[in-house]
């Protein structure tokens, strides 16, 4: 179930909160990390699920249950690990790359439109940028950094029946 997935992700995140020895950062960050132990359990594609996105306050209730699951799981695991409980636990955040990799709507947002253009920026010295250009992917110089950055455009199609922002009130 989704609740079990949130519980397991929270356990992993709480384990991760014990990793505070950042050799490449100043000690103030180690201190901050050990005090706050922030925890993010990322849900994405929420609006791709028809039930919570279309029926009254179902989404709100579901997110509250999942948040409570994450907070309670974190408290129990922190106690076992003898570390402070996280000062903040979040279950929804903006999503970019993960939603693209899984073809899911970003975070809690509906998809943009049935058809849209997805843009991706690349540094002109990056071999991937050079490869995309050599393959004829539509591209143009970035308006803010035309000498160093290229913007690629990819046509996108939302899945059939996907909820789009134009359907939201």
Enumerate the language-model features and the residues they cover:
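Catalytic alpha/beta core of large soluble enzyme barrels
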Residues: 1-25, 32-35, 94, 101-169
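Internal maturation/activation junctions in enzymes
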Residues: 20-27, 45-94
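Terminal amphipathic helices with adjacent charged low-complexity linkers/tails
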Residues: 37-43
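Electropositive phosphate-/nucleotide-binding environments in soluble metabolic enzymes
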Residues: 40, 64, 68-71, 122, ...
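Short, electropositive, low-hydrophobicity segments enriched in small/polar residues
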Residues: 44, 49, 100, 111
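Short capping micro-motif at the N-terminus of alpha-helices
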Residues: 87, 100-101
């Amino acid at each position: 179930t989704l609740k079990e997935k949130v519980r397991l992700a929270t356990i992993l995140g709480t384990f991760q909160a014990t990793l505070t020895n950042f050799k490449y950062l100043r000690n103030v960050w180690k201190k901050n990390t050990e005090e706050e132990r922030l925890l993010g359990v990322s849900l994405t594609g929420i609006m791709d699920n028809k039930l919570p996105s279309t029926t009254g306050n179902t989404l709100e209730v579901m997110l509250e249950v999942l948040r409570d699951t994450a907070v309670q799981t974190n408290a129990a695991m922190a106690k076992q690990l003898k570390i402070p409980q996280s000062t903040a636990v979040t279950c929804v955040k903006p999503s970019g790359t993960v939603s693209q990799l899984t073809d899911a709507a970003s975070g809690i947002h509906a998809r943009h439109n049935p058809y849209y253009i997805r843009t991706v920026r690349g540094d002109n010295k990056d071999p991937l940028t050079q490869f995309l250009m050599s393959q004829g992917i539509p591209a143009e110089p970035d308006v803010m950094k035309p000498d160093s950055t290229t913007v690629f455009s990819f046509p996108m199609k939302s899945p059939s029946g996907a909820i789009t922002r134009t359907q939201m009130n």
